[in-house]
Amino acid sequence: TIVSRGMAGGYTRFLPDEETHYRTPSMFKDQLVSALGGHAAEELIFGEASTGPSNDIEQVTRIARAMVTRWGMSDRLGPRTFGKTEEMVFLGREIAETRNYSEKIAEEIDDEVRRLIEEAQERARQMLRDKRDILEKLVNVLMEVETLEGETLTRLLSSDPKEPWPPTDLESKNQAPPPPAAEEQPRRP
């Protein structure tokens, strides 16, 4: 949505397609790319990014760091964990992290986190450059309806950018109706 919520100028929420407790590095990398989409779009359209995607950047940094330090998803550092996180179990949040590694390893962790984020940022930029016509179509639709969800958004993004969108009955609905069905993409296990 482009409707402001608190300090946020817009809002993106991802709901899982299916319940899964296991995530792969490629799933996390795709999530990084998606979260950096707003930042990359601002750079593409306005020439520089604003403070708008600051929460997205926090999220990306947190995920990339966890990939390296908690889940052993770094080719360079291998399947190891770094640091011990103290959690407040009843509140469900972390309160402190004990560092149990050297300054050299800390630098390698930072390098890996930076690499993951930079690769995701470049993927986001390239995707938006390649699909700029669809990006512009999405912007135009959001300016009219303010919020898009699930299947409608998926169909809009997979529609032909040259076809008119939205349909003429848009004014009578809160959200643009879905375009013709696109072929389903295979799902990851």
Specify the residue positions occupied by each region the protein language model found.
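Soluble catalytic regions of large protease machineries
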Residues: 1-189
